[in-house]
Amino acid sequence: MTRHFLRDDDLSPAEQAEVLDLAVQLKRERWSERPLAGPQTVAVIFDKSSTRTRVSFAVGIADLGGVPLVISTANSQLGGKETASDTARVLERQVAAIVWRTYAQSGLEEMAAGTTVPVVNALSDDFHPCQILADLLTIREHRGDLAGQTLVFLGDGASNMAHSYLLGGVTAGMHVRIAAPAGYVPAAVVVADAERIAATTGGSVRILADPVEAVTGADVVITDTWVSMGREEEKAQRLAELGAYQVTTELMAHAVDDAIFLHCLPADREYEVAAEVIDGPQSVVWDEAENRLHAQKALLVWLLRQS
């Protein structure tokens, strides 16, 4: 049966652990898996510009023996004359998998429903599951077993990153806290899904307004840009409303002594995070960026095995 990865909870707890174990192997033995040898082609479609996503998928597909076919929607029929479903049916005749960085989650769902090859969400407005796999790998490397650890995300709790931390974190059995002001809280349906998963994994979900309360006793502190692509006109308002959630050395002092700091990048220093934090000893953002490669390779290997 074809498996897709559109949301973090498309993997069960056991499957998520299996992918992370495989990522550890591939980081240690980079060319130990070659499921795309032939070579086979993987379509990598971009509606949004990217550095880390484009490089990590292109390099990862090549590492697995394949050829990355990078497509811009500006230079294709997708989203214009052709539906996502029709595009998927064309691509499946020629590629082994489809990776899509886009806007609407519904487009990914339509594409997945219309194809027999795996579809991977490389980012949507609602979720960023590949990033969370990389982050979980990074946390595991630096802090050991994921279950029982407390992960805090501060800032825009309605963002794709916050949604994915909720789902991916509780799938791993973590205690996930989102610290955000009114108007920036996660979607209720995502919170409900996370709570349902947490009830089976031993994790938990808390949505808080106070950043100090949220960070107190945390093992992992995370933030993301306050002004995402396409929201530049909201910059002044967002900086004013989210200013109290900046990750500073003073805020990090409320976490456990050996807490780590993550940020998926690109970062706006002195907005969502102080320079002394992201460039300081608790920051693991460069390991996190590298781990996009290993986590995504593991995901592709796993999906191709299932399919």
UniProtKB/Swiss-Prot annotation:
A Gene Ontology molecular-function term?
amino acid binding
One Pfam family here: OTCace
- The disulfides recorded in the entry are none
Subcellular localization is given as: Cytoplasm
Residues reported in the UniProt entry to bind carbamoyl phosphate: S50, T51, R52, T53, Q77, R101, H128, P129, C130, Q131, C264, L265, R292
Specify which residues bind L-ornithine according to the UniProt entry for this protein.
Answer: N160, D224, S228, M229
**Which Gene Ontology CC terms are recorded?**
cytoplasm
GO annotation, biological process: arginine biosynthetic process via ornithine; citrulline biosynthetic process; L-arginine biosynthetic process
EC number(s): the record gives: 2.1.3.3
Q: In which pathway does it act?
A: Amino-acid biosynthesis; L-arginine biosynthesis; L-arginine from L-ornithine and carbamoyl phosphate: step 1/3
Entry keyword set: Amino-acid biosynthesis, Arginine biosynthesis, Cytoplasm, Transferase
Reactions this protein catalyses:
carbamoyl phosphate + L-ornithine = L-citrulline + phosphate + H(+)
Q: Which family does it belong to?
A: Belongs to the aspartate/ornithine carbamoyltransferase superfamily. OTCase family.
Q: Which PANTHER family match?
A: ORNITHINE CARBAMOYLTRANSFERASE, MITOCHONDRIAL, ORNITHINE TRANSCARBAMYLASE, MITOCHONDRIAL
- Which function does this protein serve? Reversibly catalyzes the transfer of the carbamoyl group from carbamoyl phosphate (CP) to the N(epsilon) atom of ornithine (ORN) to produce L-citrulline.
**What is the protein named?**
Ornithine carbamoyltransferase
What is the protein's species of origin? Answer: Clavibacter sepedonicus
